[in-house]
Amino acid sequence: LWEMTDEWKYTRNYGRGQFRTDQARYYKAEKDFQVDLNGDGTIGYKLKNIESKGNKKLFQDNINGFHVRDEKGALHEIIRGSKKVKANATWQLKAAERVGGFDLVLDQNVKTKNFYLWEMTNKWKFTRNYGRGQYRTDQARYYKAEKDFKVDLNGDGTIGYKLKNIE
């Protein structure tokens, strides 16, 4: 990006050097100029739907950041510690929903299937862990969260307790 005078004469490079497709500022420039710079058919982030069962929809963008679309259609980046939350090899965001009057995000360990619930502001900024620490697959509250978020977190094919016929 170049900074120009009112007479459209070059003054200097704008920003901090080259804008790359793996940087959030690249996609901000696409939105600011309303142009698809990388030819992916989308202006701004290309979003993949992660979960869309309730009033809140969870998306992951093409540089691994997470976003929530609220019931009014507004898209919010999920922020923790002033940084955009990104996926990693161990932890993945699985769902976002309003439960019991709180906006919550479910952050799951991909190996153990245990998870934390994050309490968020209405702008989807992390405030604190919700509840009493990590939710484990041997706890009733784990299965309540499956029902609250309408997702099968442990991969058993059932939302909530898996019941066995004993008769």
Outline where the language-model segments fall.
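Long, low-complexity, Gly/Thr
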Residues: 1-167
